[in-house]
């Protein structure tokens, strides 16, 4: 059994929106997950596609794994730091804008 991990830290995406995409590819074959991510019109899908391709490349290069046997094991989307910005409003007031980020972890394994 071989398990390979790829991580993306501080992705400019809220964890809630990232989890919507993560739920679609969890426990899928790698080829099926790539197809799903390519045709999903979400920002998180684009980020996870690059991360999944990185995990596949890690498995191939470091462990000599066969792509056809690989399966997406764990997809974890956790909250990261929130960037706090200020938007000026009328009469000298200001509103806070929270730009949320997340950490995405994908584990790929050849386990059935």
UniProtKB/Swiss-Prot annotation:
Pfam families tied to this protein: Ribosomal_L22
Highest taxon in the source lineage: Bacteria
Keywords: Ribonucleoprotein, Ribosomal protein, RNA-binding, rRNA-binding
GO cellular component: a single term: cytosolic large ribosomal subunit
InterPro entries noted in UniProt: Ribosomal_uL22 (IPR001063), Ribosomal_uL22_bac/chlpt-type (IPR005727), Ribosomal_uL22_bac/org-type (IPR047867), Ribosomal_uL22_CS (IPR018260), Ribosomal_uL22_sf (IPR036394)
A biological-process GO annotation: translation
SUPFAM superfamilies attached to this UniProt entry: Ribosomal protein L22
GO molecular-function terms, A-Z: rRNA binding; structural constituent of ribosome
HAMAP family reported in the protein's UniProt record: Ribosomal_uL22_B
NCBIfam families: rplV_bact
Complexes and interactors: Part of the 50S ribosomal subunit.
Protein task: This protein binds specifically to 23S rRNA; its binding is stimulated by other ribosomal proteins, e.g. L4, L17, and L20. It is important during the early stages of 50S assembly. It makes multiple contacts with different domains of the 23S rRNA in the assembled 50S subunit and ribosome. The globular domain of the protein is located near the polypeptide exit tunnel on the outside of the subunit, while an extended beta-hairpin is found that lines the wall of the exit tunnel in the center of the 70S ribosome.
Family: Belongs to the universal ribosomal protein uL22 family.
Protein's recorded name: Large ribosomal subunit protein uL22
Source species: Legionella pneumophila subsp. pneumophila (strain Philadelphia 1 / ATCC 33152 / DSM 7513)
